[in-house]
């Protein structure tokens, strides 16, 4: 089957129904393409006006439909979905050249994580970093080898209700494609624990594709189901990146990496 033909999922709003899903996978081919090329669906549409690559002469070929094209995956677990994709399997499109997506043979033991890296266009050749510094004011995460800055990511971090825990922390471990225990009462500021829902893993999980666990209990660095909110919306105390940046960062850090949170 082609790269674009896979099962897509309708993600319900209700956490109880989310917990019934096997996986919180991609909702559409459009969303999957945008994550693969580290951008938004809107940018991909701008690069492919009318459903064909910008600057290409002539009309689009068969199978390269535009905005009114319906989903091509008849085997999807959600054949009743009314969402129409702009892009279709087999369509020739223009995309950002993100590079560095080679996964070295034998480098990743977890096959599910290897599949995630491939779907996000993240290669295994990443720098090993000694220190990361998160700036709440700057909405940035800077990664260093010694004194050399080797990576800079935009992040969302903390809120007045759940402030970023300023200070130095250790990395305890990493969880790839983790399930997520979700308690709406706690996240809405309630003092009492409410009903907890165990949400399945996937790119549309509240913590995205990876959780980098910190020595501060309940706090971590993780991905997101809503990449367009990074750098804009606040988070529940944790540090949130796009899924592709979180996956890159996971390949850079280890338990010996120093973590500093600044105001």
Name these PLM-found stretches.
Residues 1-5, 43-112:
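Extracellular LysM carbohydrate-binding repeats and other cell-envelope/extracellular binding modules
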Residues 30-31, 41, 45, 90, ...:
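Extracytoplasmic/secreted envelope proteins and their assembly/folding machinery
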Residues 82-85, 91, 96-168, 172-174, ...:
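Cell wall/extracellular polymer interaction/catalysis modules
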Residues 53, 185-263:
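Exported/periplasmic cell-wall-interacting domains
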Residues 16-34, 80-82, 127-131, 198-202, ...:
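Second-shell loop/turn segments in exported
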Residues 35-53, 98, 146, 247, ...:
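Sec-exported extracytoplasmic/periplasmic mature domains
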Residues 1-46:
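Primarily a LysM-type cell-wall glycan-binding module
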Residues 30, 46-49, 65-82, 115-130, ...:
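N-terminal post-signal-peptidase region of extra-cytosolic proteins
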């Amino acid at each position: 089957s082609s790269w674009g033909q896979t099962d897509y999922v309708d993600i319900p709003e209700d956490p109880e129904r989310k917990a019934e899903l096997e996986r919180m996978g991609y909702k559409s081919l459009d969303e999957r393409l945008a994550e693969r090329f580290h951008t938004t669906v809107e940018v991909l549409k701008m690069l492919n006006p009318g459903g064909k690559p910008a600057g290409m002469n002539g009309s689009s070929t068969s199978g390269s439909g535009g905005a009114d094209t319906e989903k091509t995956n008849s085997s999807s677990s959600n054949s009743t979905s009314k969402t129409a994709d702009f892009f279709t399997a087999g369509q020739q499109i223009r995309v950002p050249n993100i590079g560095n997506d080679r996964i070295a043979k034998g480098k990743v033991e977890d096959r599910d994580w290897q599949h995630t890296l491939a779907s996000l266009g993240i290669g295994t050749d990443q720098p090993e970093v000694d220190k990361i510094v998160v700036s709440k004011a700057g909405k940035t995460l800077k990664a260093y080898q010694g004194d050399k800055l080797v990576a800079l990511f935009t992040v969302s971090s903390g809120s007045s209700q759940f402030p970023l825990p300023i200070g130095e922390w250790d990395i305890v471990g990493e969880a790839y494609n983790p399930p997520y225990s979700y308690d709406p009462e706690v996240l809405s500021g309630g003092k009492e624990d409410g009903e907890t829902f165990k949400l399945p893993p996937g790119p549309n999980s509240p913590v995205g594709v990876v959780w980098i666990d910190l020595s501060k209990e309940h706090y971590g660095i993780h991905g997101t189901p809503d990449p367009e909110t990074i750098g804009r919306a606040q988070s529940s105390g944790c540090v949130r990146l796009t899924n592709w940046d979180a996956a890159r960062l996971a390949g850079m850090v280890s338990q010996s990496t120093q973590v500093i949170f600044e105001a």
